[in-house]
Amino acid sequence: MEMQRLHLYQLGPRAYALSRKKEIFKRNFQDRMHRIHFAQTYSEACLPVVVNKHNSLIRRKLGKVDQQLQENKAVNLALAAPRLTHLLIRPGETFSFWHCVGECTAEKGYREGLTISGNHPSSSIGGGMCQMTNLIHWMVL
């Protein structure tokens, strides 16, 4: 019988935190090596043409999911939105949600919000960011 290899993140909470930091370091290193130029210019001036607009329901009743997670998601989205508002993405620049918003931590005011983990509803600090990133994805399409 072949033994299955354990990943670092499977060894417990501390190992998970270490694995997470390793992956962030790896991603940042790769970004630098590939000389990716991320959009980071903001402008208060309105652009002359509105290409797309969309309104999305923030608070939803989702089966047996604790409604407080929906309220916290609204708080999390309100914290992230100003980091994206008025961002200019010029030719040759790359948009990165995580470079603009950064890590969602309790220290920054983010709350425990709804997340999906292994096809099941769950919760974690900063939960709800997927709704914003999905909205951005659909607006770009």
Tell me what each language-model feature is:
Residues E2-L141:
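Well-ordered beta-sheet/strand-loop patches within structured domains
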